[in-house]
Amino acid sequence: MSFQGTSSGSSHSSKSKLNQVVQNFFSKATQVVVQARLNPRLREQRQSGDKHKLNKWFNLETDELEAYREDLKLWRTIDIYNMDKMPPVVVETYLDMRHLSPNQTLVLEDAFGKRWNASFGGRKTEVVLERWVIEIQRPDPQAGGATTSPASSTELPMAYKKCILLFRSLYTYCRLLPAWTLQKRLSKSKLSTSPLRIGCRVLNGSQPISSRGRVGLSKLIAGSSESQHLQTFSFDPVEIPSGVFKISVSYRVNCNFAVDDSEAMLSSQFLRIDEEKPVVPPSPPVKHPSMAAPNLHYITGLPRRHSHSQGVGVSGAAIVPTSVSSVTDYMERRRSSGASGVGATGGGLAGTSGGSGGVSGGVSGGSGGSGGSGGWGGEEGSPGPAATSASPSTPPFARVPSSSSLAALRIPRRTISNSSTSSTNNARVVTTPGYTPSAYEQAISSSGGSSRSGSVPKYSSSFGTRQWNRSGSISSTRRRNSMLVGSAESAMSSGSSLMEPGSGFIDIEDPTDVSDFVKMVDSIKPGSPYSLPSPRKGSDPLARFQQLKGSHAGIADSITSSIYHHQPSPPYVRSKLSGEANLEAISSLPRPVTVPPSPRKLETQMQPISLADQHTSEYHQLQQRTSARPQAHSYSERDQLDNSHYKALERYDLVGASPSVVGSRYYTEHDRGRGEKRYSVAPLPGLEFDEDDDLLFAMSDMAMGDSASGGNVRT
């Protein structure tokens, strides 16, 4: 009996010790977590009314908080042998937002420095930071596990020692989590109390946990992924005779909460919305063949399809609108429309004996079948030789690579703009169906389309739109002629180029004098000295005019002396030599003789050929106006002066002399029959000018006289 009583007493003490270990296990674990999260000042206030007690279980001294004693009443009075399943203890750590003012907002700053609203418009009052779960898992008898048996004297002490290691790990790990950092940051604000507070709540794990009015642990606040904002950690379990001790925690990784102004938070949200808008990547540039093709054609000479969407000119070129004032605008319109420049009907209008199958036929004048049908306006007929001989990779009537378009770009805009209007007016009527060109238009098309399209004139009236090579003029002409007749590719290139001279786009008419000048220059060899045909054979113009110098000086002196000697009556002097004989009264006082104007200024005022008729009419008008004036001198003096002047003037060759001398002679001859004394000649403005001007002016007069009379000069 004594043995049975001893064994029953030992088993009862073993059960009581096991129950104490289990009860203190739940209470000690809860106290360690709560004391690590609560503010020390708040913890002191809660302990102020109670006697300070220390909890030394599991070799860890902690404060005994009586505030959570009622919450842990179930687990403090538990009997492990009488309960089949023990509920777990859940300790939640949360952030309390109830003390925030209306103009304050809880924000969460992420790792990139962005702030996110965590109050959700004031509808939430708490944010769950951590959730601790403390439990004992007992073996299930239905699953074949061992039933609860009294702990032996050797098993319980070993389990207690393992629990000491577990609580030390729990105490350390609680101070490594983000919630501990938040609690230390909030407790450092000594000057002002933060409206944010961290609280803990003890819950029964066997009952459902509601998240109404608070932000749950699984709720995503920041703009990070769900797998990053929440993590879970479990401690190593400790086995006891009646089951297994387990502690686990789930916590938020980012607990960088702060209080911010509501208006500032609102503006930051707007900025964040703008930053989070998906940026549409720029679409790759769309290449338009119609815009890129013309540049390649002019640079590399690639094949280019022709179109008959625009009219065809008389010489085979496309009609240029009259409103286009520059080549650049015209080419831009050509690129936008995608049309080329040459039509198939240019061959028939260029003076050929039939329809042309291609551009080569239209330019060189070869006869062929009807116009080609591929890309040439849809005319019926078989394609010409140029179309049939093209390679399969090259489109019909493709442009042959050449440098004609590059050279055409160098043509000044003024030449093209001036000639484009006339070329357009002549070529516009050709596009009308059933129109029969007139003889004048056929002549223009025959000369401009067939001849000028192949051979480029070397000179023009402006002398600024063509390049002139004196040494290679004959060879270049032969080379162009051979390219025009013998090479179909050169004919196609010259006929299809819109900018090339002679294509109809530029209408050039060479004057006769320019062509004569070109012939004269071509006849001179590069090494030969420049010489002009002499006005008279065997005479030197320089020596001739040097001999006239003394006679001119003598005539000037005689006229000047006659004016000084005969001054009693006011003379009447002609104001101009251009045909108007206005008489002006001059003072009777003697005045010095002024220097006459230069002959170069008198060139535009008097023409020697028509002075006879003009002076005849002037003489009669002067005779009628001055018939009533008194005679101051005798007729003998007047006749003597006129005879001396006339004899002096007859000694000179007046054909090559200055126009002023010729005018003086005509005036003197018509004045000889007058019966009164009149000083009709002022100092002759051709006798006292510079010798160099006289020489140059006389040479030009001689050249004009020789060309008119064929070299027969009157002496």
UniProtKB/Swiss-Prot annotation:
Pfam family, one: ATG13
One of the GO BP terms on file: protein transport
GO molecular function: protein kinase regulator activity
This protein's GO CC annotations: Atg1/ULK1 kinase complex; autophagosome; cytosol; phagophore assembly site
Biased composition range(s): Polar residues: 458-476
The keyword Cytoplasm is annotated on this UniProt entry: yes
Compositionally biased tracts (Gly residues): 340-381
Presence of keyword Plastid: no
Compartments in which it is found: Cytoplasm; Preautophagosomal structure
Compositionally biased intervals (Low complexity): 382-392, 414-432, 445-455, 486-500
This protein's UniProt keywords: Autophagy, Cytoplasm, Protein transport, Transport
Region feature Disordered, mapped onto this chain: 329-510
Domain of life: Eukaryota
Subunit note: Interacts with ATG1 to form the ATG1-ATG13 kinase complex.
Family designation: Belongs to the ATG13 family. Fungi subfamily.
PANTHER family found in the cross-reference section: AUTOPHAGY-RELATED PROTEIN 13 (PTHR13430:SF4), PTHR13430
Function: Activates the ATG1 kinase in a nutritional condition dependent manner through the TOR pathway, leading to autophagy. Also involved in cytoplasm to vacuole transport (Cvt) and more specifically in Cvt vesicle formation. Seems to play a role in the switching machinery regulating the conversion between the Cvt pathway and autophagy. Finally, ATG13 is also required for glycogen storage during stationary phase.
Protein name (database record): Autophagy-related protein 13
